[in-house]
């Protein structure tokens, strides 16, 4: 199982995408929006397909709050008319998709806690892997010897100290789904989308149901479906 922290460039991109979606919800009760973000080396590129017109100044402020003083390239295009009509008289499944929910394992919980503990001390780009008894910690801007004292059996920064962040790496939306969803990864990403998108709502529903029943959950839907797993999609 691999886990990255909130300062990993891919997660920074996810956070920016989520912030843009939040702006849409401030403007409309049920906006339709899909956001893609590419960030790195001083620039943040954003494309938003949306029913809402957003102020670029607000988008830029969100980027600066999350990622620092970057140059923001923001492109906004209207939602496709056929897709808009699909939701005209009620919330329906916004895309075809397959979805899987898997119970969280003790390994997942352990590594997630390790990631939180390290990030609380070193709030910088980091990636961590747990494979049985093998623990690999790659943490930027950290005192390697300090981490080795806390985790004496871990492989810490195998190539030595490193800086990380968007000055040395790029980040893109939905590129760390394994970190987000562990064994529940399927075809669609969670980030940068409104709640009518099945990649958000049905993925989360399947995950939560798997935790509730302690068994895998497999679902699928077609664009336009108004029920999933026997329940109204609008729920």
Where are the predicted features?
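A domain-level signal for the structural core that forms small-molecule/cofactor-binding pockets
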Residues: 1-235
